[in-house]
Amino acid sequence: MEPSAEDGGATSSSRAEKGEPPRDPVEQARAICLRLLTGTPRTRRQLAEALRKREIPEEAAEEVLSRFEEVGLINDGAFAQAWVESRHHGRGLARRALARELRTKGVEAALIDVAVSQLDTEQEEETARDLVARKLRATRGLDRDKRLRRLAGMLARKGYSEGMALRVVRQALEEEGEDTEHLGDEGF
């Protein structure tokens, strides 16, 4: 393309190449969504909020979001399943914590239930044991009750139930030779 007086002598007249935002609200919404989806998957609600913050008209936002869902660029179910897989294996989060995170991201309850059902109680307990085993050494030298509170508290913050947390921590302490017979069930 030849430079012209209209485009200031630039060799390109594409707004995208000049870094200018498109003027049409639908094009603006499409560009914003594509840019956000490039870095990481996002939920429909996250994208809708981003468009709302950028003052994209609701009709244009809805049109783009619906089209992106049709072609599979937005898929809250797949997002939820990938999130559960990643956060459980990467951070050791339990079903309860994962469900809470997905709710804050705007995933529907039915999709959350399907995603967290990937994890069964045995997997959760095995992950809890691994987490406790990694932290156990750092608590050596502390009294038994303090160790129990710290380790069970760590599991609770990751979404594990009180019962499972106490059971897993007791087992780990027993395997280490701690006397856990008189540890109360009053919580941590």
From Swiss-Prot:
One of its GO terms (biological process) is regulation of DNA repair. Its main location: cytoplasm. It is found in: Cytoplasm. Keywords: Cytoplasm. InterPro entries: RecX_HTH_1st, RecX_HTH_2nd, RecX_HTH_3rd, Regulatory_RecX, WH-like_DNA-bd_sf. Residues 15-27 have a biased composition (Basic and acidic residues). The keyword Cytoplasm applies. It holds the Pfam family RecX_HTH1. Residues 1-28 are annotated as: Disordered. The keyword Cytoplasm applies. GO terms for cellular component: cytoplasm. HAMAP family: RecX (MF_01114). Modulates RecA activity. PANTHER family: REGULATORY PROTEIN RECX FAMILY PROTEIN. Belongs to the RecX family. This is Regulatory protein RecX. The lineage of its organism: Bacteria, Bacillati, Actinomycetota, Actinomycetes, Kitasatosporales. The gene is recX.
